[in-house]
Amino acid sequence: SSYVVKPGENDVSTKDVYGGTTRFFSQVMTKRGIEVNFCDLYDEEKLSNLINDKTKLVWFESPSNPGINIFDIEKYAEIVHKSNAYLVADGTFTSPFITRHLEHGVDIVFHSTTKYIGGHSDTLGGVVTTNKEDVWEKLYEYQKTSGGIMSPFDAYLCQRGLYTLGPRLVMHSANAHKLAEYLE
């Protein structure tokens, strides 16, 4: 995100995000001169008030980790897109198999391939997806200059995980549904 956001600009992030994300925003981004505002995304008015001309991205997870909070993605896309900011989601918790963020108005989606996509806890990596041409060009330029490319073996391990992603998540969902019914 520091390639999309420049010093003097700002990010808005929900408070309820993965600890590594919180550390990245509060320790890395702020040292680069980027202001980071954490807020409760359930408060639409507060979110709207935090977004200004310097806001370049609004970051969230839905469901969030660790709180498992669900956000109305389309509503937040509507709020964010009234500005020049991008709506960015970490989709790791549900994978693209369950939550298709881009179809609900999200501009950029991150996934840790270490989790569901890899599926076997034996790879390290991540992917970034977008359907915005201008974002794609910035990300591709950054990838080419920084060398942010997965090793061939890690790519193979992720491909292997993708073969079983659907069946694994169908079973996860069925088990979660049974548990929810039991707890009602």
Predicted regions mapped to residue ranges:
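Conserved PLP-enzyme active-site core in the AAT-like
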Residues: 1-184
